[in-house]
Amino acid sequence: MTKKILLASLFIAFSFSVNAQSWWGNNKKVKGNGTIIIEKRTTSNYDAITIGGSFDVVLIKGTEGNITLKGEENIIPLIETEISGGTLKIKYKKNTNVKTTRRMVVTVTVSEIESIALGGSGNIISKTELISDDFSVSLGGSGNIELGINADETNVNIGGSGNIDLKGITNNLKCAIAGSGSIRAYNLTTSEINATIAGSGSVKATVKNKIKANLIGSGSIYYKGNPKQIDSKSIGSGSIIEKN
């Protein structure tokens, strides 16, 4: 149980860290003026992306470092796009409380990405397949992520009520959910899956060889395919369910 509590704490901390500036403190309150503009920015290369805020982020294939923001003219200047340790961080400036009246869309070019993280209620969708030896995606909060991937090993983590939709191919899928989030990956074919669920979350995947699961609570794993081996430990009403 300690591992699950630690997982939940880590994601709560992640979500808090990227959104805290909008919750407390002497924040500057800004409401969108409704006038839509487009701004282009450039950065150095990155191999990871972290999003903090209620943005709609679209990933497209291209040379890294080209970012396009489409949104309200008085809101866009409050969005930071910076590189730190090889990670592109997109978030609102500190001490700002932003209320948009129009959709805020950030388009990011990618070529080789190893990690994606979202904190809050935003959305990330990839229009290109993400290819990596070792890929990870993390979601803290109620946001949504949709990705197409081709990776040897894929790590997926959710803390909260968000959803992650995956399609593509991976050899080894490792999942961890703390809360009511869902990993929807029937369109992702994996040789093996190792999943830990603490709460009422769910994992859906297509598995060829092996399923290993640790379930605490009412969370369940739904699978398609014909895995040769299924190992499960459960405390609560959670279960592994075939959906062929």
Enumerate the language-model features and the residues they cover:
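Intrinsically disordered, low-complexity terminal regions
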Residues: 1-244
